[in-house]
Amino acid sequence: MNLAPTTLLLFAATALAELVGCYLPYLWLRNGGSVWLLLPTALRLASFVWLLSLHPDASGRVYAAYGGVYIASALGLWLWWVDGVTPTRWDLLGAVCCLFGMAIIMFAPRSA
């Protein structure tokens, strides 16, 4: 069974949950947003933890590989769409390197 699509979808959903869960308190603290932003923050961060728990692999491996997806998401999506800053070619190259690292960690052949 090929777990790559499932793993990648889980990582993408996890990254979105973490990015939103970290951005909402940023809005509250930095931009004077409502304290009510902390409620969806808690829900997003709880969903982030839950999504990480769905991976069948060892937690340390999942956390390490997820870091690469988070970096790529933060640069390729959040920086561009939310912050309105176009990533440089170096940002994109770094994100691609991180995704290669994630793929090596998660999809390398292993003995059972």
From Swiss-Prot:
It is found in: Cell inner membrane. InterPro entries: UPF0060 (IPR003844). The keyword Membrane applies. The keyword Transcription does not apply. NCBIfam families: PRK02237.1. HAMAP family: UPF0060. This is UPF0060 membrane protein XOO1791.
